[in-house]
From Swiss-Prot:
It comes from the Bacteria. The lineage of its organism: Bacteria, Pseudomonadati, Pseudomonadota, Gammaproteobacteria, Enterobacterales. NCBIfam families: PRK10917.1-1, PRK10917.1-3, PRK10917.1-4, PRK10917.2-2, recG. One of its GO terms (biological process) is DNA recombination. Residues 482-628 form the Helicase C-terminal domain. This is ATP-dependent DNA helicase RecG. SUPFAM superfamilies: Nucleic acid-binding proteins (SSF50249), P-loop containing nucleoside triphosphate hydrolases (SSF52540). GO terms for molecular function: ATP binding; ATP hydrolysis activity; DNA binding; DNA helicase activity. Transmembrane segments: none annotated. Residues 48-146 are annotated as: Wedge domain. Monomer. Plays a critical role in recombination and DNA repair. Helps process Holliday junction intermediates to mature products by catalyzing branch migration. Has replication fork regression activity, unwinds stalled or blocked replication forks to make a HJ that can be resolved. Has a DNA unwinding activity characteristic of a DNA helicase with 3'-5' polarity. The keyword Hydrolase applies. InterPro entries: ATP-dep_DNA_helicase_RecG (IPR004609), DEAD/DEAH_box_helicase_dom (IPR011545), Helicase_ATP-bd (IPR014001), Helicase_C-like (IPR001650), NA-bd_OB-fold (IPR012340), P-loop_NTPase (IPR027417), RecG/Mfd (IPR047112), RecG_dom3_C (IPR045562).
């Protein structure tokens, strides 16, 4: 294998990678050894030294070693195994909700155990829930890690340990194979080489300052951030050039349907909505495809803007497709559009992954014949077997869940008779202007900066978890005395959907016991779509008082009677995501409240962030504050808003680099076209395909 380029070495050549693991790795776009080396850690854990159990502080992640004192299984309410260990300085209780007989047998009294996890304050002193542990052999000194331990973004069925072992093999290959240096010499001078940077980031020595890594300031990160931002900018330059070569159906003014809808509405559009609709209509009258991003705060009325844009296309006898990220949100859109469009004689179709057999077939036939003019659904609407009949406009709701390459794939799927559909992309995640210019440089941007009248601002309070019982009483009062409904949102910092679902289930059990007089529902990401739909429908119809949920309810769910939201561990989420969640209440005329139920002690930055939410309901103000206050160790921004197009760069954190990166990208685009193409291929392979279209 000596001398080969690592972008040509498949992962199947690594020890332990068979067909099943290859398929799982492909789900996170890992196909070659180069892909794996560019799959960088989300964060790091310091497992290089031991903490005395007696000195553990709540909230600290630590490695401890101790002798097993006892290990017991209890069956009260929920099966649980507890194991107590001691190192002489104190006693730690390890708590497991998922365990096997083999685990119980391995933790025999007298055995020595090395454990890593988050220390918490329990009923009987220090405890860790589901720590990682290893039973020690006869060695007098524990086997500690020699480098900081990386935590990678992963997918179901791929463990951290697997990714770490595979990455070790990939790093060894750097000695015998090559990874191409693509930066022109005048740029890379004085910088770390690519192999050096990759070794440092995958296996940082314990002497390296964690704060440097957490703030993205380490030279190894700067080397890769520069390359990734350049690739992103180069891809935007290529896409802009490519888009101008496409043709779209020009849709001139035809306002009969629009005027009918406006006359039937019980309210008048805001000035901001009217301005944005005018910008969209100007674009749609041209013979090149519109590519416009509409930003609007939670509840600003983006759906009406989308409806008015859709009517322009339908008035010309064309079809419109609206794609939402979840079936939950797509179904809600379908209902809204039916209420508005059916009185105008417009048929609204609905396509989602859960549809099977005859229902799906008849819906596909209605779309292919042109009987259905407005099609609403999830990504299922762009599957191979769906044939459109004159598709002229594609609306994508919640852009941050669809990557650049996904929105470009819609061009390909929607193309008919040489015409490409116009594209309208809507997001409720406000982005400060400088960042929007970079993240969406291939799009024109409109902003709905005005809320409709009659919305009640949500009152937000931050309360420590020690007052949990008071909050449960507050939920009881809201649901029974006031006749309202409430959300209880569980958050988890882990990248595992399974652990998040388990946390939500545990909270659901707890609240059912504490509130026997309430009907309590549960919704999380691992439930089947049909189960989620059924629970949400029950909540919307008022059959459930309280909904325990993970962050799956972040987007678009609309239940006007819900006036109270509890968010557990809000310190784990970014401001934008907290603001999105809070937007699920305050959708009716009644006063609404959001309780941020935090664990103590709070970091200084977390305190400031929660204060921002208490002080403001304006998403654009909150986005700007997010830029100003994000402190060390809090990797928010692109990863947490779901913009997975960036592996190492963070548009919020790295914004100071953006003007220079834009200048350098133009230089490379003009002077080094081959390197430009290779950079896009390395960092954004899907986009590269479309920029050649």
């Amino acid at each position: 294998m000596t001398g080969r380029l690592l972008d040509a070495v498949p992962l199947s050549s690594l020890t332990g990678v068979g067909a099943a693991l290859s398929n799982k790795l492909a789900k996170i776009n890992l196909h070659t050894v180069q892909d794996l080396l560019l799959h960088l850690p989300l964060r790091y854990e310091d497992r290089t030294h031991l903490y005395p159990i007696g000195e553990l502080l709540p909230g600290v992640y630590a490695t401890v070693e101790g002798e097993v004192l006892n290990c017991n299984i209890s069956f009260g309410g929920r099966r649980m195994m507890t194991c107590q260990i001691s190192d002489g300085s104190g006693i730690l209780t390890m708590r497991f909700f998922n365990f096997s007989a083999a685990m119980k047998n391995s933790l025999a009294t007298g055995r020595r155990v090395l454990a890593y996890g988050e220390a918490k304050r329990g009923k009987y002193g220090a405890e860790m829930i589901h720590p990682e542990y290893r039973v020690q052999g006869d060695l007098s000194t524990p086997e500690l890690q020699e480098t900081l331990t990386p935590v990678y973004p992963t997918t179901e069925g791929v463990k951290q340990a697997t990714l770490r072992k595979l990455t070790d093999q990939a790093l060894d290959l750097l000695d015998t194979c090559a990874i191409e240096e693509l930066l022109p010499p005048e740029l890379s001078q004085g910088m770390m080489t690519l192999p050096e940077a990759l070794r440092t980031l995958h296996r940082p020595p314990p002497t390296l300052q964690l704060s440097d890594l957490e703030t993205g300031q380490h030279p190894a990160q700067r080397r890769l951030i520069l390359e990734e931002l350049l690739a992103h900018n180069l891809s935007m330059l290529a896409l802009r050039a490519g888009a101008q070569r496409f043709h779209a159906q020009p849709l001139s003014a035809n306002d009969a349907l629009k005027n009918k809808l406006l006359a039937a509405l019980p309210f008048k559009p805001t000035g901001a909505q009217a301005r944005v609709v005018a910008e969209i209509e100007r674009d749609m009258a041209l013979d090149v495809p519109m590519m416009r991003l509409v930003q609007g705060d939670v509840g600003s009325g983006k759906t009406l803007v989308a409806a008015l844009a859709a009517l322009r296309a339908i008035a010309h006898g064309k079809q419109v497709a609206l794609m939402a990220p979840t079936e939950l949100l797509a179904e809600q859109h379908a209902n809204n559009f039916r209420n508005w469009f059916e009185p105008l004689g417009i048929e609204v179709g609905w396509l989602a992954g859960k549809q099977k057999g005859k229902a799906r077939l008849s819906q596909q036939e209605a779309i292919a014949s042109g009987q259905v003019q407005m099609i609403v659904g999830t990504h299922a609407i762009f599957q191979e077997q769906v044939q459109f009949n004159g598709l002229a406009l594609v609306i994508i709701d919640e852009q941050h869940r669809f990557g650049v390459h996904q929105r470009l794939a819609l061009w390909e799927k929607g193309q008919q008779q040489g015409f490409h559909p116009h594209q309208l992309i809507m997001t409720a995640t406000p982005i400060p202007r400088t960042l929007a210019m970079t993240a969406y440089a291939d799009l024109d941007t409109s902003v709905i900066d005005e809320l409709p009248p009659g919305r009640t601002p949500v009152t937000t309070v931050a309360i420590p978890d020690t007052r949990r019982t008071d909050i449960i009483d507050r939920v009881r009062h809201a649901c029974i005395t006031e006749g309202r409904q409430a959300y209880w949102v569980c958050t988890l910092i882990e990248e595992s959907e399974l652990l998040e679902a388990q946390a939500a289930e545990a909270t659901w059990e707890e609240l059912k016991l504490a509130l026997p007089e309430l009907n309590v529902g549960l919704v999380h990401g691992r439930m089947k779509p049909a189960e989620k739909q059924a629970v949400m429908a029950s909540f919307k119809q008022g059959e459930l008082h309280l909904l325990v949920a993970t962050t799956v309810i972040e987007v678009g769910v609309d239940v006007p009677n819900a006036s109270l939201m509890i968010i557990e561990n809000p310190e784990r989420l970014g401001l934008a995501q907290l603001h999105q969640l809070r937007g699920r209440v305050g959708r009716g005329a009644v006063a609404s409240h959001c309780v941020l139920l935090y664990k103590t002690p709070l970091s200084k930055t977390a305190q400031i962030r929660l204060q921002v939410l208490r002080d403001s309901n304006d998403g654009f103000v909150i986005a700007q504050k997010d830029l100003e206050i994000r402190g060390p160790g809090e990797l928010l921004g692109t990863r947490q808003t779901g913009n997975a197009e960036f592996k190492v760069a963070d548009l919020l954190r790295d914004q100071a680099m953006i003007p220079e990166v834009q200048r350098l990208a133009r230089h490379i685009h003009e002077r080094y076209p081959q390197q430009a193409k290779a950079l896009i291929e390395r960092w954004m392979p899907e986009t590269e395909r479309y920029s050649n279209a």
